[in-house]
């Protein structure tokens, strides 16, 4: 790729705005689920599908994008992504019944499933290795800001307008992205004749779909129920068969040779732990603040805002530090901040001052910001160029699956501990919620400590 005549600014703007909207939509609806279950007259388990369905679609489609990026041009993939995003968003905004809204969510997620891997692939193609950290830092900002701002902005919208506006508000941004992309995005990938192996797609769908589905409904059906246990087992078996098939094929759907690179595997593990912890925290923390500290949804969003904002300010700086000093200088201090954050969260009860929550969240988000983009950059830098599409598909899929598992398991533990407290200790809901979140944050703390240890083995790929 000739780096001279490529206008990186407009290209990044088009890709990142579309990515931001997709990730914003991923979490923005969570705050409206209670209201929507009443409007559509469906129960809490059913309404949860608006979130689960989104995750499930990502888990199923992202593995396939690795091969699609080799079959279709960058521009074709970009246009397809925006087509899905815009159609899905408009359909969601006008949805008269639950089934239409759910369908719209799946179409929206399809758009995001394409744009995330595509953005990473374009960054790794249009930026030379010494500038990738900075560019990935900006992408990391978007990956964190989208889900983090979702609940805050949605809370404001729900207070003033109706839930439809959670969708309408994003349309101008998607149109901006479409126009910029149309004029500026070049074809950066070399396409080749790839035949898509149907059996691989089926195994991957059953595999990732089964695991994400099984884990997502675990809390409702009980972890030992046949539905949950069965779908997870079937999913795992399908994934094993999928992996075996990939290693035997000449042109695999997902090239697993990426796993031969130790730094890639190390980064992948750290990335999964970070996502498992982060996405479950973004769900459990608002539950703790609303149930134990009794603050409104809107106030919860405001408490979490400074951490998210500072993260946006620091993301590009962290990226430049990574480019200059290498991975360990940024990642290890970041993992230590995350450990401090979870250690503090685990000690909070029903009397915690709100300013303490703000400060802790800032520490936490800074730590995550230092870890996330840097780990992703280093993980992919460990691979030769021809493995980028596969490496990206593997990282993106594993983080979606880890996030889905994190949310499902941590919310289940939160509820179980909370209910146990109510029956065994006292009928005191705030204290029960605090005991539930405390358990979750202590478990997350253990994962966070594992990440500190793993970060010590991080180094710059040769």
Locations of regions flagged by a protein language model:
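Flexible interhelical linker loops that connect adjacent transmembrane helices
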Residues: 2-3, 130, 178-205, 247-262, ...
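Helix-loop-helix hairpins in multi-pass membrane proteins, especially solute transporters
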Residues: 62, 66-199
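Alpha-helical transmembrane segments of multipass membrane proteins
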Residues: 90-91, 156, 209, 213, ...
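Short, membrane-exposed interhelical loops at transmembrane-helix boundaries
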Residues: 422-435
